[in-house]
C-alpha cells in the first residue's frame, strides 16, 4: 500500500499526464482495469481519423474529460493495489476492444497475434530450448537484430558467440549520423516487445535510438560479451564435421577461425552505400559525402550544396541543413509521395513519459493500437483490383482516395507555387515506392535559396553539375543521398554452403531468395534475420518482424535438441515453392506496378526486399517451425557430447550419421 504522501504525488503526476493521453487507449485501459462494458459503448465510440493515432478519438470535449477523469480514478485504484479486472483477456474481448478503439472492424484472425504481443510486452519469454553440451551459435552483428537474438539466446541458456565490426551496438543507428537522421516509424513501435523505449519524442532521432540499443544490451547482460571490432569475412559450411567455420578479422588486424554448429546472420540490409553512376563525380573539385558515411567535420555554413537524390535520407538531411547553407540544389531523379507528419520532432511531454513508464498497461495498449494502424490496416489498399478503371494512377478505390488525400496535402503545402506542385506530384500510385513522411520537406522547397531540379544529375565537371536538361548548377559540396545496396543480402560477408557454392552463386548475385526470409536451401544450420522479402513496404514494426524470425529460429533449435538433430537444411522444393508464391503474390500488389522504378526490385525486375504478407499471416508462418520443410540429420552415437564442436573449438573426426530423406 502506498503512503498517502506518495499516493498524492503519484495522483498529481498522472493528472498532469492525462490531458495529453491518447483517448482511444484510455478507453482500452478503462475496460481492462474496471471490466465495465460502459466504456466500449456509445457515446464513447471513437471516430476514425485520417492521419495519425487519433489522440482525441474525435470525441466531444466533455466526453474526453469524463474518460480522463475515470482513467485517473482507475489508475489510482490499481496503483493502490486493486487487481486488474480483465487481466487475462479472451480473443473475443481483445478484438472487440480494438474494434472500438480503432473505429473499424479488426478481423478475428488478428486476436492470437495481438494477445501474443501483450504477453511479450508483459515480459513473457519463448519456451525453453535444450541443446547438447558444447553446441554453439555464431551471431554476426550487434545491431537491432543481433541484440535481440543475443538476448533471447542468453535467456534460454543457448551458448553463443557474437561479433560486431563496429565499436558499439546499434548497427545502422550507430554508423549513420547525418543531420536529421531518425526513424519514420513511431518510437513506441520501433522498440523491442520486451524493452520499453522511454522515448523523449514520438519519432526519435538517431542518437536516442542508438542509445536505446546500447541501454538494452547493457540491461539484459549481453553487452560485455560482444566481440567488438571483429568482422566476419567468410563463413563456410564443412560437410564432414557438419559445422560452420567462420574467418574473423580481429581488432588488431589478425585473423582467427571460429567453429560453431549454427550461424545466425544479423548483418542488416543498410550496410553498403549505393553510389550513383554519375560521370565525373569522383573528380568533383570539392568534398563529396554520402549520407551513410557522413563526415561531421564537413563545412556547410554558407556553402553552395548540391544533394543527389530525394528519397528517405534526402528528406531528412535537406530540411536539417537548409538554414545553414548559402544555396541548396536538389537533383530529383524521381518524384515521391510524401505523407503528413504531424508528430515530427514532437516531444513526448515529461508527464506522458511518466505515464508510459509508471502505468505499463497504458503503454502496452498504446503500442497495440499503433501496431494495427502502422502494421496492418494499409495492406488491403495495396492489392490490385483487376476491375479498377484507372490502373495508371492507382490500383484500387482505396488507393485512389489515398492519392487524392496526399495530392491535396501537397497542394496545400505548396499553395501559390504551381511550378513546384507540377514538379513534385508523382504519376504512379501512392505506396508504389517507399512512402515518405514530411519532416519539413515542402516547407524547405519554398525557401528562396533552395532549387529543386526535376531530373537526375547527368555529369560533373569541376564544380559544375549538369542536369539531364543540360542546365548547369554550381556547388562547393555534394551530398550523395542515393541510399543503399538493398538487393544484395548478407553483404559484405561471404557465405559458402554445401558443395562449396557461395550464396552469391546461388542467388546469381542479386536475385536473393529465402524460405520465410530466414533460410536458404543448400546452407544447413544457417539462418538470417531481415532476409529477402521481409521488409514491410506497407509500414509497420520491423523490430516485431525480427523478433518473430528469432522465435522461428528458436523453434528450429528447440526441435533440434528434442530430436537430437545435428543438421537441418531447407528442402529445395519447399524453398522454390515458397519463392514462387511470393512472386505470384507480388504480381497482384502495387510494387509490381509498371509506372515507377523502386529499390524494392533487383536489376531483373523481381521484388526482393518487400514482404507480400499481412503481418499476421507472416507471424503465423513463423510461429512454429515445421521440420517437414527440412532435410534433417540425427545424431546416432549417444556417447557424443556435442553436435560437431568440441569445447576447444578443434574439428573432430566425422561421426556416424544418417540423413533423413527429403
Swiss-Prot record:
PANTHER family in UniProt: FAD_NAD(P)-BINDING DOMAIN-CONTAINING PROTEIN-RELATED, L-ORNITHINE N(5)-MONOOXYGENASE-RELATED
Family, per entry: Belongs to the FAD-binding monooxygenase family.
Site residues by UniProt (Transition state stabilizer): 434
GO molecular function, one term: monooxygenase activity
Organism (species): Sinorhizobium fredii (strain NBRC 101917 / NGR234)
Cofactor requirements of the protein: FAD
Positions bound to FAD: 145, 164, 173, 184, 190
Pfam families attached to this UniProt entry: NAD_binding_8 (PF13450)
Keyword annotations of the record: FAD, Flavoprotein, Monooxygenase, NADP, Oxidoreductase, Plasmid
InterPro entries the record matches: FAD-bind_Monooxygenase_sf (IPR051209), FAD/NAD-bd_sf (IPR036188)
Residue spans crossing the bilayer: none
Enzyme class label: oxidoreductase
Protein name from the UniProt record: Uncharacterized monooxygenase y4iD
EC number of the protein: 1.14.13.-
Region described as Disordered: spans on this chain: 638-662
Amino acid at each position: 500500500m502506498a503512503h498517502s504522501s506518495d499516493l498524492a504525488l503519484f495522483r498529481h503526476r498522472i493528472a498532469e499526464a492525462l490531458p495529453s493521453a491518447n483517448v482511444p487507449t484510455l478507453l482500452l485501459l478503462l475496460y481492462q482495469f474496471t471490466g465495465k462494458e460502459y466504456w466500449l459503448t456509445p457515446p464513447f465510440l471513437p471516430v476514425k481519423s485520417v492521419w495519425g493515432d487519433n489522440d482525441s478519438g474525435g470525441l466531444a470535449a466533455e466526453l474526453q474529460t469524463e474518460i480522463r477523469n475515470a482513467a485517473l480514478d482507475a489508475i489510482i485504484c490499481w496503483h493502490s493495489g486493486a487487481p486488474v479486472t480483465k487481466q487475462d483477456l479472451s480473443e473475443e474481448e481483445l478484438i472487440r476492444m480494438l474494434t472500438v478503439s480503432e473505429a473499424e472492424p479488426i478481423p478475428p484472425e488478428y486476436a492470437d497475434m495481438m494477445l501474443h504481443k501483450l504477453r511479450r510486452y508483459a515480459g513473457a519469454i519463448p519456451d525453453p530450448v535444450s541443446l547438447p553440451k558444447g553446441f554453439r551459435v555464431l551471431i554476426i552483428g550487434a545491431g537491432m537484430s543481433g541484440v535481440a537474438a543475443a538476448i533471447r539466446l542468453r535467456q534460454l541458456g543457448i551458448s553463443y558467440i557474437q561479433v560486431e565490426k563496429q565499436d558499439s551496438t546499434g548497427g545502422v543507428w550507430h554508423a549513420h549520423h547525418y543531420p536529421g537522421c531518425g526513424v519514420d516509424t513511431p518510437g513506441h513501435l520501433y522498440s523491442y516487445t520486451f524493452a520499453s523505449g522511454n522515448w523523449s519524442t514520438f519519432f526519435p532521432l538517431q542518437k536516442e535510438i542508438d542509445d536505446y540499443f546500447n541501454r538494452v544490451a547493457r540491461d539484459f547482460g549481453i553487452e560485455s560479451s560482444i566481440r567488438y571490432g571483429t568482422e566476419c569475412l567468410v563463413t563456410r559450411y564443412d560437410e564432414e564435421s557438419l559445422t560452420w567455420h567462420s574467418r574473423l578479422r580481429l581488432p588488431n588486424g589478425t585473423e582467427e577461425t571460429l567453429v560453431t554448429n549454427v550461424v545466425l546472420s544479423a548483418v542488416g540490409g543498410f550496410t553498403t552505400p549505393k553510389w550513383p553512376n554519375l560521370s565525373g563525380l569522383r573528380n568533383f573539385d570539392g568534398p563529396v559525402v554520402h549520407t551513410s558515411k557522413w563526415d561531421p567535420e564537413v563545412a556547410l555554413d554558407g556553402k553552395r550544396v548540391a544533394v543527389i537524390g530525394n528519397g528517405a535520407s534526402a528528406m531528412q538531411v535537406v530540411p536539417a541543413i537548409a538554414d545553414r547553407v548559402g544555396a541548396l540544389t536538389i537533383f530529383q531523379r524521381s518524384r515521391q509521395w510524401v505523407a503528413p507528419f504531424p508528430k515530427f520532432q514532437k516531444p513526448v511531454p515529461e508527464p506522458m513519459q511518466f505515464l508510459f513508464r509508471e502505468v505499463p498497461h497504458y503503454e502496452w495498449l498504446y503500442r497495440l493500437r499503433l501496431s494495427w494502424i502502422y502494421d496492418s490496416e494499409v495492406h488491403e489498399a495495396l492489392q490490385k483490383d483487376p476491375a479498377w478503371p484507372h490502373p495508371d494512377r492507382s490500383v484500387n478505390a482505396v488507393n485512389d482516395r489515398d492519392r487524392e488525400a496526399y495530392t491535396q496535402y501537397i497542394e496545400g503545402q505548396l499553395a501559390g507555387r504551381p511550378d513546384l506542385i507540377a514538379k513534385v506530384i508523382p504519376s504512379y500510385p501512392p505506396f508504389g515506392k517507399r512512402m515518405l513522411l514530411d519532416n519539413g520537406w515542402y516547407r524547405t522547397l519554398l525557401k528562396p535559396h533552395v532549387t529543386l531540379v526535376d531530373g537526375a544529375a547527368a555529369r560533373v565537371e569541376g564544380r559544375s553539375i549538369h542536369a539531364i536538361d543540360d542546365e548547369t548548377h554550381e556547388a562547393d559540396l555534394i551530398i550523395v543521398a542515393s541510399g543503399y545496396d538493398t538487393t544484395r543480402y548478407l553483404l559484405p560477408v561471404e557465405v559458402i554452403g554445401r558443395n562449396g557454392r557461395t550464396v552469391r552463386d546461388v542467388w546469381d548475385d542479386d536475385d536473393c531468395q529465402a524460405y520465410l526470409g530466414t533460410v536458404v536451401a543448400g546452407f544447413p544450420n544457417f539462418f538470417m534475420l531481415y532476409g529477402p522479402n521481409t521488409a514491410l513496404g506497407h509500414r509497420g514494426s520491423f523490430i516485431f518482424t525480427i523478433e518473430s524470425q528469432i522465435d522461428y529460429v528458436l523453434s528450429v533449435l528447440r526441435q533440434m535438441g528434442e530430436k537430437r538433430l545435428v543438421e537441418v537444411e531447407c528442402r529445395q522444393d519447399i524453398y522454390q515453392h515458397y519463392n514462387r508464391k511470393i512472386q505470384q503474390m507480388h504480381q497482384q500488389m502495387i510494387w509490381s506496378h509498371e509506372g515507377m522504378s523502386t529499390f524494392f526490385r533487383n536489376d531483373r525486375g523481381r521484388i526482393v526486399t518487400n514482404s507480400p504478407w499481412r503481418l499476421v499471416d507472416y507471424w503465423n508462418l513463423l510461429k512454429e517451425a515445421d521440420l517437414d520443410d527440412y532435410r534433417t540429420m540425427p545424431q546416432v552415437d549417444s556417447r557424443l557430447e556435442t553436435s560437431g564442436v568440441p569445447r576447444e573449438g578443434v574439428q573432430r573426426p566425422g561421426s556416424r550419421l544418417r540423413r533423413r530423406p527429403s
